[in-house]
Design a protein with these regions (language model features):
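Interfacial loop-to-helix junctions that mark the boundaries of transmembrane helices
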Residues: 1-6, 23-25, 52-64, 177-186, ...
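Transmembrane alpha-helix interface/packing and boundary motifs in multi-pass membrane proteins
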Residues: 18-25, 77, 110-118, 152-158, ...
Length: 329
Protein backbone atom coordinates (compact mmCIF):
# COMPACT_ATOMS: atom_id res chain seq x y z
CA UNK A 1 0.00 0.00 0.00
CA UNK A 2 2.94 2.30 0.66
CA UNK A 3 3.99 2.17 -2.99
CA UNK A 4 0.43 3.10 -4.03
CA UNK A 5 0.47 6.14 -1.73
CA UNK A 6 3.91 7.23 -2.93
CA UNK A 7 2.86 6.70 -6.53
CA UNK A 8 -0.32 8.76 -6.04
CA UNK A 9 1.66 11.50 -4.31
CA UNK A 10 4.10 11.52 -7.22
CA UNK A 11 1.29 11.96 -9.75
CA UNK A 12 -0.25 14.76 -7.67
CA UNK A 13 3.09 16.57 -7.30
CA UNK A 14 3.80 16.13 -11.01
CA UNK A 15 0.42 17.59 -12.00
CA UNK A 16 0.85 20.56 -9.67
CA UNK A 17 4.40 21.07 -10.87
CA UNK A 18 3.35 20.99 -14.53
CA UNK A 19 0.63 23.56 -13.88
CA UNK A 20 2.99 25.95 -12.08
CA UNK A 21 5.88 25.59 -14.54
CA UNK A 22 3.72 25.97 -17.66
CA UNK A 23 2.09 29.08 -16.19
CA UNK A 24 5.61 30.38 -15.62
CA UNK A 25 6.23 29.86 -19.35
CA UNK A 26 8.49 26.83 -19.07
CA UNK A 27 8.17 24.84 -22.31
CA UNK A 28 5.96 21.71 -22.12
CA UNK A 29 8.77 19.93 -23.98
CA UNK A 30 10.85 20.34 -20.80
CA UNK A 31 8.00 19.97 -18.30
CA UNK A 32 6.60 16.71 -19.73
CA UNK A 33 9.75 14.56 -19.35
CA UNK A 34 10.50 16.04 -15.90
CA UNK A 35 6.99 15.17 -14.69
CA UNK A 36 7.32 11.65 -16.11
CA UNK A 37 10.69 11.25 -14.37
CA UNK A 38 9.24 12.35 -11.02
CA UNK A 39 6.35 9.88 -11.25
CA UNK A 40 8.69 7.09 -12.34
CA UNK A 41 11.04 7.60 -9.37
CA UNK A 42 8.26 7.91 -6.76
CA UNK A 43 6.46 4.85 -8.17
CA UNK A 44 9.57 2.67 -8.01
CA UNK A 45 9.50 1.98 -11.75
CA UNK A 46 12.62 1.34 -13.86
CA UNK A 47 13.67 4.89 -14.72
CA UNK A 48 15.41 4.35 -18.06
CA UNK A 49 12.79 1.99 -19.48
CA UNK A 50 9.90 4.17 -18.32
CA UNK A 51 11.23 7.49 -19.62
CA UNK A 52 12.92 6.38 -22.85
CA UNK A 53 10.42 3.61 -23.55
CA UNK A 54 6.91 4.22 -22.22
CA UNK A 55 7.09 8.03 -22.20
CA UNK A 56 8.62 8.38 -25.66
CA UNK A 57 6.19 5.79 -27.05
CA UNK A 58 3.28 7.80 -25.64
CA UNK A 59 4.59 10.99 -27.23
CA UNK A 60 5.19 9.26 -30.56
CA UNK A 61 1.82 7.54 -30.60
CA UNK A 62 -0.05 10.83 -30.16
CA UNK A 63 2.10 12.54 -32.80
CA UNK A 64 1.54 9.80 -35.38
CA UNK A 65 -2.19 9.59 -34.69
CA UNK A 66 -3.01 13.30 -34.85
CA UNK A 67 -0.28 15.09 -36.81
CA UNK A 68 -2.30 15.31 -40.03
CA UNK A 69 -5.26 16.81 -38.16
CA UNK A 70 -3.10 19.56 -36.67
CA UNK A 71 -1.34 20.21 -40.00
CA UNK A 72 -4.50 20.39 -42.13
CA UNK A 73 -6.35 22.43 -39.51
CA UNK A 74 -3.49 24.93 -39.56
CA UNK A 75 -3.44 25.10 -43.36
CA UNK A 76 -7.22 25.60 -43.54
CA UNK A 77 -7.00 28.35 -40.94
CA UNK A 78 -4.12 30.04 -42.76
CA UNK A 79 -6.12 30.08 -46.01
CA UNK A 80 -9.00 31.70 -44.15
CA UNK A 81 -6.65 34.25 -42.65
CA UNK A 82 -4.71 35.36 -45.74
CA UNK A 83 -7.80 35.42 -47.98
CA UNK A 84 -9.78 37.59 -45.59
CA UNK A 85 -12.53 34.96 -45.27
CA UNK A 86 -12.09 34.77 -41.50
CA UNK A 87 -12.34 38.55 -41.27
CA UNK A 88 -15.48 38.45 -43.42
CA UNK A 89 -17.12 35.97 -41.03
CA UNK A 90 -16.14 38.17 -38.10
CA UNK A 91 -17.55 41.27 -39.81
CA UNK A 92 -20.80 39.42 -40.52
CA UNK A 93 -21.20 38.43 -36.88
CA UNK A 94 -20.43 42.01 -35.84
CA UNK A 95 -23.21 43.27 -38.13
CA UNK A 96 -25.61 40.79 -36.52
CA UNK A 97 -24.85 41.81 -32.95
CA UNK A 98 -23.16 45.23 -33.08
CA UNK A 99 -20.67 46.85 -30.70
CA UNK A 100 -23.27 46.89 -27.92
CA UNK A 101 -22.99 43.10 -27.80
CA UNK A 102 -19.23 43.08 -28.23
CA UNK A 103 -18.62 40.00 -26.07
CA UNK A 104 -21.30 37.93 -27.80
CA UNK A 105 -19.95 38.86 -31.25
CA UNK A 106 -16.35 37.93 -30.32
CA UNK A 107 -17.43 34.66 -28.71
CA UNK A 108 -19.54 33.54 -31.67
CA UNK A 109 -16.91 34.55 -34.25
CA UNK A 110 -14.26 32.42 -32.53
CA UNK A 111 -16.70 29.54 -31.97
CA UNK A 112 -17.75 29.45 -35.65
CA UNK A 113 -14.15 29.13 -36.83
CA UNK A 114 -13.43 26.51 -34.17
CA UNK A 115 -16.46 24.46 -35.19
CA UNK A 116 -15.17 24.64 -38.76
CA UNK A 117 -12.10 22.61 -37.78
CA UNK A 118 -9.62 25.50 -37.78
CA UNK A 119 -6.74 25.26 -35.31
CA UNK A 120 -7.28 27.56 -32.34
CA UNK A 121 -3.81 29.11 -32.61
CA UNK A 122 -4.74 30.34 -36.09
CA UNK A 123 -8.14 31.59 -34.92
CA UNK A 124 -6.47 34.01 -32.50
CA UNK A 125 -4.69 35.82 -35.33
CA UNK A 126 -7.71 35.68 -37.63
CA UNK A 127 -10.17 37.10 -35.08
CA UNK A 128 -7.86 39.60 -33.38
CA UNK A 129 -8.26 42.53 -35.84
CA UNK A 130 -12.08 42.23 -35.82
CA UNK A 131 -12.24 41.88 -32.04
CA UNK A 132 -9.92 44.86 -31.63
CA UNK A 133 -12.20 47.02 -33.78
CA UNK A 134 -15.19 45.93 -31.69
CA UNK A 135 -13.38 46.74 -28.46
CA UNK A 136 -12.51 50.18 -29.83
CA UNK A 137 -16.16 50.89 -30.67
CA UNK A 138 -17.26 49.64 -27.25
CA UNK A 139 -14.37 51.54 -25.57
CA UNK A 140 -13.18 48.50 -23.61
CA UNK A 141 -9.61 47.79 -22.41
CA UNK A 142 -7.84 45.28 -24.65
CA UNK A 143 -6.67 43.03 -21.79
CA UNK A 144 -10.21 41.58 -21.79
CA UNK A 145 -9.93 40.53 -25.44
CA UNK A 146 -8.00 37.23 -25.03
CA UNK A 147 -10.50 36.01 -22.43
CA UNK A 148 -13.57 36.26 -24.65
CA UNK A 149 -11.83 34.95 -27.79
CA UNK A 150 -10.37 31.96 -25.92
CA UNK A 151 -13.76 31.42 -24.29
CA UNK A 152 -15.26 31.07 -27.76
CA UNK A 153 -12.75 28.60 -29.15
CA UNK A 154 -11.44 26.59 -26.17
CA UNK A 155 -14.61 25.65 -24.30
CA UNK A 156 -17.91 24.47 -25.83
CA UNK A 157 -16.65 24.79 -29.43
CA UNK A 158 -13.79 22.39 -28.70
CA UNK A 159 -15.66 19.81 -26.63
CA UNK A 160 -19.33 20.17 -27.59
CA UNK A 161 -21.43 17.84 -29.77
CA UNK A 162 -20.53 17.74 -33.50
CA UNK A 163 -17.20 19.54 -32.95
CA UNK A 164 -14.38 18.42 -35.30
CA UNK A 165 -11.72 19.57 -32.80
CA UNK A 166 -9.08 17.28 -31.32
CA UNK A 167 -10.80 16.77 -27.93
CA UNK A 168 -13.88 15.31 -29.58
CA UNK A 169 -11.85 13.30 -32.09
CA UNK A 170 -9.74 11.65 -29.37
CA UNK A 171 -12.92 10.60 -27.55
CA UNK A 172 -14.41 9.22 -30.77
CA UNK A 173 -11.32 7.17 -31.59
CA UNK A 174 -10.63 5.98 -28.04
CA UNK A 175 -14.19 5.24 -26.92
CA UNK A 176 -15.89 4.55 -30.25
CA UNK A 177 -18.50 7.26 -29.63
CA UNK A 178 -20.10 9.39 -32.37
CA UNK A 179 -19.38 13.11 -32.66
CA UNK A 180 -22.72 13.89 -31.02
CA UNK A 181 -22.34 11.58 -28.01
CA UNK A 182 -24.25 12.90 -25.01
CA UNK A 183 -26.17 15.24 -27.32
CA UNK A 184 -28.71 16.73 -24.89
CA UNK A 185 -26.34 17.11 -21.89
CA UNK A 186 -23.64 18.36 -24.26
CA UNK A 187 -25.85 21.02 -25.83
CA UNK A 188 -27.14 22.08 -22.42
CA UNK A 189 -23.59 22.34 -21.07
CA UNK A 190 -22.51 24.31 -24.15
CA UNK A 191 -25.31 26.83 -23.66
CA UNK A 192 -24.46 27.18 -19.96
CA UNK A 193 -20.77 27.69 -20.76
CA UNK A 194 -21.48 30.31 -23.44
CA UNK A 195 -23.92 32.23 -21.23
CA UNK A 196 -21.59 32.19 -18.21
CA UNK A 197 -18.58 33.27 -20.28
CA UNK A 198 -20.46 36.24 -21.77
CA UNK A 199 -21.93 37.14 -18.37
CA UNK A 200 -18.53 37.04 -16.66
CA UNK A 201 -16.75 39.01 -19.38
CA UNK A 202 -19.51 41.65 -19.45
CA UNK A 203 -19.20 41.89 -15.67
CA UNK A 204 -15.45 42.45 -15.95
CA UNK A 205 -16.03 45.04 -18.69
CA UNK A 206 -18.48 46.91 -16.46
CA UNK A 207 -15.95 46.89 -13.61
CA UNK A 208 -13.23 48.17 -15.95
CA UNK A 209 -15.44 51.06 -17.07
CA UNK A 210 -16.21 51.79 -13.42
CA UNK A 211 -12.47 52.14 -12.79
CA UNK A 212 -12.24 54.62 -15.66
CA UNK A 213 -10.38 52.26 -18.01
CA UNK A 214 -10.71 52.79 -21.77
CA UNK A 215 -9.58 51.30 -25.06
CA UNK A 216 -5.87 51.73 -25.75
CA UNK A 217 -4.66 50.89 -29.27
CA UNK A 218 -1.78 48.38 -29.40
CA UNK A 219 1.70 49.63 -30.25
CA UNK A 220 2.50 49.30 -33.94
CA UNK A 221 -1.16 48.77 -34.86
CA UNK A 222 -2.63 45.61 -36.35
CA UNK A 223 -2.16 44.32 -39.85
CA UNK A 224 -5.44 44.35 -41.75
CA UNK A 225 -6.27 42.22 -44.78
CA UNK A 226 -5.67 44.16 -47.97
CA UNK A 227 -7.34 43.47 -51.30
CA UNK A 228 -10.61 41.76 -52.21
CA UNK A 229 -12.29 39.41 -49.75
CA UNK A 230 -14.68 36.51 -50.44
CA UNK A 231 -18.42 37.12 -50.09
CA UNK A 232 -20.20 36.28 -46.85
CA UNK A 233 -21.93 33.13 -48.15
CA UNK A 234 -18.78 31.92 -49.92
CA UNK A 235 -16.74 32.39 -46.72
CA UNK A 236 -19.03 30.03 -44.82
CA UNK A 237 -19.06 27.24 -47.45
CA UNK A 238 -15.76 25.41 -46.63
CA UNK A 239 -16.41 25.51 -42.86
CA UNK A 240 -19.97 24.29 -43.36
CA UNK A 241 -18.70 21.48 -45.60
CA UNK A 242 -16.22 20.34 -42.92
CA UNK A 243 -18.89 20.31 -40.19
CA UNK A 244 -21.51 18.53 -42.32
CA UNK A 245 -19.15 15.93 -43.80
CA UNK A 246 -17.58 15.21 -40.40
CA UNK A 247 -20.95 14.55 -38.78
CA UNK A 248 -22.97 13.03 -41.64
CA UNK A 249 -20.43 10.84 -43.44
CA UNK A 250 -17.80 8.35 -42.26
CA UNK A 251 -14.88 9.63 -44.34
CA UNK A 252 -12.88 10.85 -41.33
CA UNK A 253 -11.69 14.23 -40.17
CA UNK A 254 -8.51 14.22 -42.31
CA UNK A 255 -10.55 13.84 -45.52
CA UNK A 256 -13.02 16.48 -44.28
CA UNK A 257 -10.23 19.00 -43.70
CA UNK A 258 -8.69 18.20 -47.09
CA UNK A 259 -12.04 18.88 -48.77
CA UNK A 260 -12.29 22.13 -46.80
CA UNK A 261 -8.82 23.15 -48.05
CA UNK A 262 -9.66 22.32 -51.68
CA UNK A 263 -12.92 24.27 -51.44
CA UNK A 264 -11.08 27.22 -49.89
CA UNK A 265 -8.50 27.26 -52.68
CA UNK A 266 -11.24 27.09 -55.31
CA UNK A 267 -13.62 29.61 -53.76
CA UNK A 268 -11.09 32.10 -52.39
CA UNK A 269 -8.60 32.05 -55.27
CA UNK A 270 -9.20 35.68 -56.22
CA UNK A 271 -8.65 36.82 -52.63
CA UNK A 272 -5.55 34.75 -51.86
CA UNK A 273 -2.23 36.63 -52.19
CA UNK A 274 -0.47 33.85 -54.10
CA UNK A 275 2.92 35.51 -53.66
CA UNK A 276 2.64 34.81 -49.91
CA UNK A 277 1.42 31.23 -50.32
CA UNK A 278 4.78 29.48 -49.84
CA UNK A 279 5.68 31.42 -46.69
CA UNK A 280 2.14 30.93 -45.36
CA UNK A 281 2.26 27.15 -45.88
CA UNK A 282 5.74 26.95 -44.34
CA UNK A 283 4.54 28.87 -41.31
CA UNK A 284 1.41 26.70 -41.00
CA UNK A 285 3.51 23.51 -41.18
CA UNK A 286 6.02 24.77 -38.62
CA UNK A 287 3.42 25.96 -36.13
CA UNK A 288 1.46 22.70 -36.42
CA UNK A 289 4.56 20.73 -35.41
CA UNK A 290 5.17 23.06 -32.46
CA UNK A 291 1.59 22.74 -31.25
CA UNK A 292 1.37 18.95 -31.54
CA UNK A 293 4.78 18.40 -29.91
CA UNK A 294 3.81 20.63 -26.99
CA UNK A 295 0.61 18.59 -26.61
CA UNK A 296 2.26 15.20 -27.14
CA UNK A 297 4.90 15.77 -24.46
CA UNK A 298 2.12 16.18 -21.89
CA UNK A 299 0.20 13.18 -23.27
CA UNK A 300 3.37 11.12 -22.81
CA UNK A 301 3.19 11.86 -19.08
CA UNK A 302 -0.23 10.20 -19.09
CA UNK A 303 1.29 7.07 -20.64
CA UNK A 304 3.73 6.83 -17.72
CA UNK A 305 0.99 7.49 -15.16
CA UNK A 306 -0.96 4.52 -16.59
CA UNK A 307 1.75 2.02 -15.57
CA UNK A 308 2.03 3.23 -11.95
CA UNK A 309 0.71 1.24 -8.95
CA UNK A 310 -1.64 4.11 -8.06
CA UNK A 311 -3.30 4.04 -11.48
CA UNK A 312 -3.91 0.28 -11.28
CA UNK A 313 -5.33 0.65 -7.75
CA UNK A 314 -7.57 3.58 -8.77
CA UNK A 315 -8.96 1.73 -11.81
CA UNK A 316 -9.69 -1.37 -9.73
CA UNK A 317 -11.43 0.76 -7.10
CA UNK A 318 -13.58 2.60 -9.65
CA UNK A 319 -14.52 -0.56 -11.54
CA UNK A 320 -15.76 -2.11 -8.30
CA UNK A 321 -17.77 0.99 -7.45
CA UNK A 322 -21.58 0.88 -7.51
CA UNK A 323 -21.87 4.66 -7.90
CA UNK A 324 -23.48 6.33 -10.90
CA UNK A 325 -21.32 5.61 -14.01
CA UNK A 326 -21.31 9.31 -14.94
CA UNK A 327 -19.89 10.19 -11.52
CA UNK A 328 -17.29 7.40 -11.75
CA UNK A 329 -16.23 8.52 -15.24
Amino acid sequence: MNEVILSGLGILLALCGMTVLIFRRVSPIIVGPLAALLVTVMSGLPVLDSVTGVYVAGVGSFFVSYFMIFLLGNILGSLYQISGAAAKIGETVVRWFGAKNCMVACLISAALLSYGGINSFVIIFAIYPIALKLFEEADLPTYLLPGIVCGGMWTFAMTGPFSPQICNIVSMQSLGTPSYAGLIPGLAASVVMAVLIVWYMNRQAKKAKGRGEHFTPPEGGVRQHEGPTPGTVVSFIPLTAVIVLFNVTEIGIVACLLIGIVLSLGLFWRSIPWGEMLSTMNQAAGSSVTVIINTATIVGFGAVAKITPFYAWAVELLEASTANPYVVA
